[in-house]
Amino acid sequence: MRWRLLGTLALWAGLAMPAVAQDMRPGIAVFPFENGGSYGQDKENFDALQVGMQQMLTTEFAQNPALRVVDRSQIKQLLAEQDLGAAGRVDANTAARIGKVVGAKWVILGGFVDFYGDFRVDIRIVNVETSEILKTEKARDKRENLYAMVTSVSTAITRGVNLPALPRQAMEMRENRKVPTEAVTYYSRALLYADRGNKDKAKELFNRAIEVFPEYTEAKEGLQQLAS
């Protein structure tokens, strides 16, 4: 398995390096979140949050012009090819190797536990060059404040790796944005079904997310990607 992983990563590195070399900003890659044992919701909702929170955090980082953000699809393909991360579990060393392939300076490994609405998020920031865990971040709140927790850990991570903060106006817009957890759940389930190749179900769920939160730009972008 180890040699197969190294061989595939070497091939990917050859393909990825030209594009990465054109962008000198430090790269950051977010891996699927791990469900650490959650109760009070359907299993599918928790499965969906593993990719939903990954994408949400990726989107938050993408608002920062100082960062080059690795697309979730690249991480998904590499993990799938190696049969890794099926349960959301990837160790720091493996994450660092994949991070090097996609030109990331940092890799974000996250997990969550939802105990009947008491929601906790745990984040590890991995230095790709050394495979060391640079810093950990945590957030805990009610499940209904899930989106706010994601924006909070995004800001904490940015500070943790000494990156410039978002411009004040952009930061205020993100912090003041109130996305209902119901919309986040529909959005996450839509991503899950899109990953499974069920475009019709994904489209239905993106639309339901927009019905709950009409300003849900990310869900609208998801619909556009399905149509392309």
Feature-to-residue mapping (PLM):
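Positively charged n-region of N-terminal signal peptides that target proteins for export
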Residues: 1-4
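Bacterial N-terminal signal peptides
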Residues: 6-18
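Residue-level detector of alpha-helical transmembrane segments in integral membrane proteins
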Residues: 11-12, 25, 58, 207
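Generic detector of contiguous secondary-structure segments
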Residues: 15, 19, 55, 206-208
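A short hydrophobic/aromatic micro-motif that marks alpha-helical segments and, especially, helix-coil
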Residues: 17, 86, 120, 227-228
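An acidic helix/loop motif centered on a single conserved Asp/Glu
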Residues: 23-162
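C-terminal/domain-edge helix-coil "capping" segments
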Residues: 22-26, 129, 133-228
